[in-house]
């Protein structure tokens, strides 16, 4: 599998390699914390501007247009906010997420599925590792590396003090089930 990943990695344009790796480890960033998530979003912004000519064609996509109008309404709401200084960073974060989505769309449309399948394989592996850890913690009261949740009735898994493993599983279950269903229907 390593040879396959290495061969496929060589077929990626140099300007896309860094964001491809970042996108591959995105689920881990959710486990590690906000700093890594923000670094990933920052790298998406850099990749967006490096590939602006390719990315700009997605501005005509209906979903992106809807997100853009949503963003504009949030900007207008900032002006009517009681505390605009406090509201503006939250609104700008929406723009960063929009750029992140455009970069993902650009990568998925630029490369063929066999290359992108590596991302889904790694995401599925991370998902199942965390899922196994959740069941381990439910059964034994601590996770596989010895962490215990602050609340005995809640599971934290690798997230430490943050009790967000349910949201993680809920979010990535959609990707995992979608990937496995696509793979089964296309006999990959």
Question: Which role fits each region the language model picked out?
Answer:
Residues 1-89, 102, 106-124, 179-188:
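Transmembrane signal-anchor hairpin modules in multi-pass inner-membrane enzymes, especially those
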């Amino acid at each position: 599998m390593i040879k396959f990943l290495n061969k496929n990695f060589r077929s990626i344009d140099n300007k896309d390699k860094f964001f491809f790796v970042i996108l591959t480890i995105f689920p881990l960033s959710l486990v590690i914390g906000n700093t890594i998530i923000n670094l990933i979003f920052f790298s998406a912004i850099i990749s967006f501007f490096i590939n602006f000519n390719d990315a700009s064609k997605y501005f005509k996509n209906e979903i992106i247009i809807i997100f853009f109008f949503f963003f504009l309404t949030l900007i207008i709401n900032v002006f009517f906010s009681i505390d605009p200084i406090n509201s503006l960073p939250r609104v700008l974060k929406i723009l960063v997420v929009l750029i992140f989505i455009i970069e993902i769309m650009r990568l998925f449309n630029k490369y063929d599925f066999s290359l992108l399948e590596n991302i889904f394989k790694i995401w599925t592996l991370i998902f199942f590792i965390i899922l196994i850890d959740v069941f381990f913690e439910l059964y034994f009261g601590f996770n596989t590396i010895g962490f215990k949740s602050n609340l005995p009735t809640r599971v934290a898994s690798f997230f430490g003090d943050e009790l967000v493993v349910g949201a993680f599983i809920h979010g990535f279950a959609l990707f995992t089930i979608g990937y496995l269903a696509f793979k089964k229907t296309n006999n990959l």
